Amino acid sequence: MAAPGTPPPSASGGGGGEPRQLPELIRLKRDGGHLREADIRNFVHAVIDGRAQDTQIGAMLMAIRLQGMNLEETSVLTRALAESGQQLEWPKAWHQQLVDKHSTGGVGDKVSLVLAPALAACGCKVPMISGRSLGHTGGTLDKLESIPGFGVTQSPEQMLHILEEVGCCIVGQSAKLVPADGILYAARDVTATVDSVPLITASILSKKAVEGLSTLVVDVKFGGAAVFPDQEKARELAKMLVRVGVSLGLKVAAALTAMDNPLGRSVGHTLEVEEALLCLDGAGPPDLRDLVIRLGGAILWISGQAETQDQGAARVAAALDDGSARRRFQLMLSAQGVDPGLAKALCSGSPTQRRQLLPHAREQEELLAPADGIVECVRALPLARVLHDLGAGRSRAGQPIRPGVGAEVLVDVGQCLSRGTPWLRVHLDGPALSSQQRRTLQGALVLSDRAPFKVPSPFAELVLPPTIAQP
């Protein structure tokens, strides 16, 4: 089922000429030069076989961050990363059905937990390779691991079986899949090179290229809690993702979505699983449901499984409302190690019953509105940073987390709020919130004196490949 990827051409092949030594490559990119294919492949080989020192990897990443890469360089880097490990192979009859979604990271972003089973209920095959929380953003794998027994490590053969029986699986990146990206990703996090368009593009698309997809939609976040606060910079990334995807023979679209407020009302691993289950019940926060339906509709339309984006969105909404998406989620839980009785209880139980089945923090503290006003914004970044400090996130790979730590936002953006009304409930294992943490959290609540308003959808725009016309 899984076969080793075709070994990349030798660094002396492609792009012309013999490969240059690493210091020369670093100097060339530092000074704004363009790297040949042979140079890029030589660098990736050196990362994998240990010839590249940590200092050289960091220097090259910083050179790329400061000087950028053109389309050709970014495409070559993406292919070289993808070819550094195994390629996943699926039955040819599945090709049109093989789809996925990726997010650049946000606060309260539990879309994958809902969207993957919803797409499976619509007839798709979703081999989703996800990540863990790092910094202030949550990780899909950590959220799922708050469910007792859920296993994110699945072999290619196990993934094939789950896709045959369920239609979706959500797994972690293994050492055999895109190992070069794993090394560069860890280095980017500690060298202040995360916010690089070519490096983000190559990292995302190399992982998705090995999945053997027909269609990918990337949720590119912008705003106060996103990698790119500015929508124009996020649009630059979206366009690069689409163009490199075309060069790889992959249909890639990018949705620009706002990440100023948390998505939904819950932040934290267990709390987000419970909110995802509400959405799978056909309920849940409107902004979460809206984003799931819009992203799912785009995927079904672009992959040719719906005639229009609206038709695709209607099918995803129906899967949420008729329970078929929730049934797929239950099957996925059982297939990935959760006791079938627990999986059934989680998916068919009430919110109160679900709360008794998942790990929760020992204490709760509520924060009160300091004044009257209209809720203009609940700033996601300071909220996420406090929860990170309380144990919901990790500062280094492998660090344990507290799945029950989190927060419930008790108000909606746009609503009228009276002084002394609870607006946030924090779940923590103790000790109590410090005065500084309380000040930071209270600073996340932005009040205004304008009239109440209805918050717009977080979905801002969709960047499509040139072969597909805007709806």
UniProtKB/Swiss-Prot annotation:
The record's region (Disordered) falls at: 1-21
Gene Ontology MF annotations = 1,4-alpha-oligoglucan phosphorylase activity; protein homodimerization activity; thymidine phosphorylase activity
Q: Which domain of life is it from?
A: Eukaryota
Q: Name one GO biological process term.
A: regulation of gastric motility
Instruction: Print the keywords alphabetically.
Output: Glycosyltransferase, Phosphoprotein, Transferase
Composition-biased stretches, type Pro residues, lie in 1-10
Family the UniProt entry places it in? Belongs to the thymidine/pyrimidine-nucleoside phosphorylase family.
| Name under which the protein is recorded | Thymidine phosphorylase
Species annotation: Mus musculus (Mouse)
The beginning of the lineage is: Eukaryota, Metazoa, Chordata, Craniata, Vertebrata
In the UniProt record, what gene is named as encoding this protein?
Answer: Tymp
